[in-house]
Amino acid sequence: MSSSIEGDPSDDLRVTPPKTWATGLPAVTHALEYSLGQTSPRRTALTLLSINQPKGIDCPGCAWPEPAPGKRHMNEYCENGAKHINDEATSRRVTREFFREHAIAELDGASDYWLNQQGRLTEPMVKRPGGTHYEPIGWDEALGLLAGELRGLDSPDEALFYVSGRLNNEAAFLLQLFARAYGTNNLPDCSNMCHESSGSAMSQTLGIGKGSVSLDDIHHADLVFVVGQNPGTNHPRMLSALEETKRNGGQVVAVNTLPEAGLMRFKHPQKARGLIGRGTPIADQFLHIRAGGDLALFQALNLLLLEAEDAAPGTVLDHAFI
């Protein structure tokens, strides 16, 4: 745990030439370096081997699905996931001595990254009226303060129960049970913030607000569009699925304002060709559009589909599905 406050880490950013491939051996070394900096080698190994396994724990790094049991890799996670899970499993601890040393005004000037790197809390802390430091507080008093706030509301619906999307299933179940017993279903989470609009639109157009395909569907798709997102950054395990698509003869079209290294070439870190070979080119085509140009692109594609359907009725559009 560092005792000196560090400010915005963006001050240390360096601009380097763009990469032309992603993952490979560097992803393995970076993940292990970070993980071993958080906890012991034994704890690191036990944690990593349990990620996304049938009797293990879900990786909190992203929402990319796991293959069916029996088809999963022993290491069913990416560099981001390894860092993420060991960030949660860290052995670092923030004690009352830390808060005695650092005033709230000091901590306010620290970066989020630095604050997170100090470790996990060991007991409840409170800021007293007029106080300059967080102070330790007993659990009974802490729960009493929360109860007093809830009792002071005119209606249960004035309360909102928002927690991290990284919360485990058991804790999430208890939270929603508590909120409903209190009298409200105001239980938003990060999925509302990320996918409320897409879920609403998909419900109106497709009848369901979430994806309806399986990983096997992606593996055997003839064509996959990757639009407006960077799988190498957002959910790198998608690259292994796209690699499988390519090896089964499918094509991938990337639509974005900037090319991403992961969609240019993917070096699978659990395969020899990924560690010592050239890896697999992912995107067959890169459609370079301006920011906000995706709507115009799909309007043009829809027009071409309609023209092709007019030229050969019944051979382009799935009328039964529509």
PLM region spans:
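Short acidic, glycine/serine/threonine-rich loops at helix termini
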Residues: A171-F178, G199-S203, P236-L239, L263-P269, ...
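Glycine-rich phosphate/diphosphate-binding loops that line cofactor/substrate pockets in enzymes
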Residues: D140-A159, V213-D222, T245-N248
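Long, well-ordered, tryptophan-enriched scaffold segments
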Residues: R93-G109, L115-N116, R120, G249, ...
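Gly-rich Lys/Arg/Thr-decorated short loops/hinges at beta-loop-alpha junctions or inter-strand turns
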Residues: R120-G131, E196-G199, H220-D222, P281
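Intrinsically disordered, low-structural-confidence terminal and linker regions
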Residues: M1-P65
